[in-house]
Amino acid sequence: MAQSIPYQNLAVEYGLKHIPTLREYLSIPCDANYKEDMYKNIEWVEKTFTQRGFTATHLETPTLPVLLLERKASNPSAKTILFYYHSDGQPVRPSEWQQENPFIPVLKQKKGDTWEQIPFERLTQNYDPEWRIFGRASSDDKGPGIMLLAALDAIKSLGISPDYHLKILVDFE
C-alpha cells in the first residue's frame, strides 16, 4: 500500500497541473449542432496531442470527421492499445445553469444543499478533493480526455517510454 502513495501524489500533481488545460478545453463550445464550434474542438484536440508526439488523421464521415491520433512505439511489432472518447456535449440551456455561462468553467465547493463558486486560485493554496469544476461536457466527456493527457504527461515525467503503440479515436458527434 505504501508504494502507491508516490503514484497518488503524482496523480494529484498532474491533475492540478492540467486544470488550465481543462479550463481552456471546456471553454470551447461543443454542441454538435454547431459545426463551426466542433471544428474548433477538432483543431484544439489535434494541436494538443500532436504537441505530445502523436500524428493525427481525419477519418471523414458524412458530418464531422473522427480524429485518429497515433503514437508508435520504437518496436514496430509492439501491441496496440486503443482509447476512445468523444468531444461533443449535449445541447445546453444556459438559463438552467447556476453560473454565468456553461462554457466558462468555474470551481465550486459544496455548501449545504448548493454549490458555491470559489476562485480557481484556491487550488494552489489548499486543494480539497471534494471541490468540483462545473462546465459543459466536463465529465462527459472532455474531462476524461484531459485525464488521459495528464496520465501521458506523468508517465513521460518518470522517463517511461511505453512499449506499445497508442491510438486514440476522438468522436465529435
Describe the residue ranges of each PLM region.
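Acidic/His- and Gly-rich active-site-bordering loop/insert found
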Residues: Q3-S138, I155-H165
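Histidine/acidic-residue-rich, glycine-tolerant segments that coordinate divalent metal ions
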Residues: D163-E173
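Active-site alpha-helical elements of protease catalytic centers
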Residues: I133, A137-A151
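Acidic side chains
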Residues: D88, D140-D141, D171-E173
